[in-house]
UniProtKB/Swiss-Prot annotation:
One of its GO terms (molecular function) is DNA binding. This is Tyrosine recombinase XerD. Forms a cyclic heterotetrameric complex composed of two molecules of XerC and two molecules of XerD. InterPro entries: CB (IPR044068), DNA_brk_join_enz (IPR011010), Integrase-like_cat_sf (IPR013762), Integrase_catalytic (IPR002104), Integrase_recombinase_N (IPR010998), Integrase_SAM-like_N (IPR004107), Recomb_XerD (IPR011932), Tyrosine_recombinase_XerC/XerD (IPR023009). GO terms for cellular component: cytoplasm; Holliday junction resolvase complex. Keywords: Cell cycle, Cell division, Chromosome partition, Cytoplasm, DNA integration, DNA recombination, DNA-binding. Its main location: cytoplasm. Residues 111-310 form the Tyr recombinase domain.
Amino acid sequence: MRAKPSDAKLTGLFLDMLAAEQGAGPNTLDAYRRDLTDFSEFLGRVGHSFADAETQTLRDYLADLDTRGFKSTSVARRLSAMRHLYRFLLNERIRGDDPAAILSGPKRGRGLPKVLSIADVDRMLRRARELSEAEDASPSKRLRALRLYCLLEVLYATGLRVSELVALPRTAAKRDARMIVVRGKGNKERLVPLNEASRQAMADYLAATEAAKSDKKTGVAASKWLFPSFGESGHLTRQHFARDLKELAVASGLQARLVSPHVLRHAFASHLLHNGADLRIVQTLLGHTDISTTQIYTHVVEERLKSLVRDLHPLAEK
C-alpha cells in the first residue's frame, strides 16, 4: 500500500501550481503557506492529514478558529485556502473527493475601507516635505526623509499596492516620465500615470541617492531598485514603509492607527471617485481584475450623485 503524501509535500505541490499556472506572487504564496501550515497543525493534533480529512474535520477546524478569536474575515480566508487546496488535490487525483466543497463560511458584510480626508493627506504630504527639506538634518537622515516623501507622493498619485510601490525599479524614475509600468498581481503589467508632484519627488530623491553613493557614511550602493535596502529582497520592505508612515502620521497630528499604505490606496480611489472619475478607470488604475472588487467604493459615487441632485436639480429647493 502506497504511503500517503505528507501535508508539507502537498503544500509544496499546491504552491508550485499557483506560481506556475496562476502567476501567484511571493506575498500570495506566503499567505497560503501560513494558512495551510496552521490547518495542517490542527489536523495533526486530531490525528488526520490533508489526504484523509473529512468534511466534519474541516468544520471542526473552522470552529477552532472561531474559538481562538479569529475574525470572520480571517476565517473566510482560511476556508478559501482549504477550498483551493482540495480542488487541486481532486484535480490531481490525489484525492477522490472534495471535503471542502459543501462547507459554508462565516457570514460577513464587506466593510467600507477607512478613508483619510484630502486635508489629512495634505497634512502628511506637507509634513513629509518639510522633513525632507530640513537643513539641519544629517545626510543619511535627509535621504530617509526624501525617500518617505517620495513614497508618499507616488502612493497618493498612483494608488499602487504597497508591494508594487516598494518594488519599483530604478527605471521608474526616468526623466520626464509621464507613466510608469507596474507589475502587479499575477505578474500582470499596467500603465499608471504620474502627476507633476510625484515626478518631482522622484527626481529629487534620485538625485540625492546619486550624490549619496560617493558618501560612504550613508551606506548607499548601486541598486536596480528605486527604494533599495540591505535586506534579502534588495528593496525596502512593506513593514518598514508602514512603520515610517505611522511615525509621519503622528508627526502630522493624526492617529497612527488610522494610517497605513492600504488606507492611502483607498484614499486615492475614493478621492478620484468623489471628484467625478469613472469607476472603470479607477478599476484599471488600481489593477483590479474584477469590477466587483472596485465596487466597494460605490458608496462614494452614490453620495456624489445625491449631492449633484440636491445641488443642481431645478426642483430640489421646492
